[in-house]
Amino acid sequence: MGRFERHLTLWVTLCIAAGTALGHFLPAAFAALARTEVARVNLPMAVLIWLMIIPMLLKVDFGAMRQVGQHWKGIGVTLLINWAVKPFSMALLGWLFLRHAFAGWLPPGQADSYIAGLILLAAAPCTAMVFVWSNLCRGDANFTLSQVALNDAIMVVAYAPVVALLLGLSAISVPWNTLILSVGLYIIVPVIAAAALRRMLLARHGQAGLEAVLRRLGPLSLAALLLTLLLLFGFQGRQIVQQPLVIALIAVPILIQVYFNAGLAYLVNRQLGVAHCVAGPSALIGASNFFELAVATAVGLFGVHSGAALATVVGVLIEVPVMLSVVRIVNASQGWYERRR
């Protein structure tokens, strides 16, 4: 992890502060940006989100799915957590905390919007940062690559139905055409574009050329992420100044679900006798979220001023420190993990 990525929480916090201040003092400018949209797609946000997502997807080798059979137990556990546990546990936690336990501290009528953001966050398995987490816990690189490729392929067809199901169960209305448009814009098109660009770069310049391009695009992707956050918090500056406690309250269910899902994946892998070098990244992939996609979908579905967009951004704020703590737990418990029952 580079110096910039290592301090991502600091940069995110600074962008949140700057965006909130600018939105509070320059509301007219941000209102004009918010109106720059076509078919409910905010154009400045769409450009930034593509710049943010495509370089990350460029790292994914979909040919690695041929290796899935080598680690079928770890793959199975991770798929179970990512698609059958995490989205549903997040919806449940959001319902318990935001609709009930914290209802008195939240802005009236916003709980459902925050829950929608949490669902969008949990339904998208992490794509890019898991390579960093896997490396930090000495994970099997082939397992990580094949798991990420498989998750991304599943996400193309499963993200919209899972999100629609959970939003429906939470009594949150979302038009299918808007959801399909968001999936097309922010999953299908970027996946196809990244896969085609990756193939072209490998054909013309080889692996070394691809890695050189990835190094150059890395800062661009992170800069787009930070500008996206600045815009999001600028759009919501006044609301945040009036309700600073909201961010801390939204973070509570996110924190619980990260540690719950990481722990569950880790323990199930141990019960199945899976090697630690696979169980570590399995737990990390099971717990982390593709927050870039969640932000994009929240903006497309509910708008830049929505509580859903704010909830997904809280996921960005806490992602790095929380996942680093999971890495430390995985590494510190390796001796215990490898002592068979």
Name each model-derived stretch.
Residues 1-59, 63-287, 291-341:
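Alpha-helical transmembrane segments of multi-pass small-molecule/ion transporters
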